[in-house]
Amino acid sequence: MNFSFVPLFLVTLILLGVVSNNNSITVSATILLLMQQTALVQFVPLVEKHGLNLGIILLTIGVLSPLVSGKAQVPPVAEFLNFKMISAVFIGIFVAWLAGCGVPLMGRQPVLVTGLLIGTVIGVAFMGGIPVGPLIAADILSFVAGKV
């Protein structure tokens, strides 16, 4: 008899996602569990190959949409010359660089994603954190641990 812990792990993530009010983990784990347990399993390699890039595209659309809706304005050039705006630009550059370290780490050592997910869920459930997900956690892990 061949037993896989993956469905149990996904159910655990679903429960932790519900308890911690982390919809992204709840929905993601539910979709993956349904895919794994049905004929949709044939599409898992496609999700594995393109899911992260599609997710980043959707995230970028979500971040830029306030500009399109008019809820946010592009500031005049003069406003880029204050300390907060300059700091925001440099922090954005730094975080983008970190992401360049974290995404490859997730591809090279996908087992670490499990730990990052568990840590994210615990941080949200018990420490009042925000579910930014494993991507920024992988970025920081890569930075702290020297590209693991």
UniProtKB/Swiss-Prot annotation:
- UniProtKB keywords: Cell membrane, Membrane, Transmembrane, Transmembrane helix
The reply on keyword Cell membrane is yes
Major localization listed first in the record, in broad terms: membrane
Matches recorded under Pfam families: DUF441
- CC annotations in GO: plasma membrane
List the subcellular locations.
Answer: Cell membrane
| Keyword Hydrolase listed | no
Q: What is the protein's membrane topology class?
A: Multi-pass membrane protein
Stretches that traverse the bilayer: 10-32, 50-70, 85-105, 116-136
InterPro entries hit by this protein: UPF0756_TM
Which protein family is it in?
Belongs to the UPF0756 family.
Name by which UniProt lists this protein: UPF0756 membrane protein NGO_1674
Q: Which species does the entry assign this protein to?
A: Neisseria gonorrhoeae (strain ATCC 700825 / FA 1090)
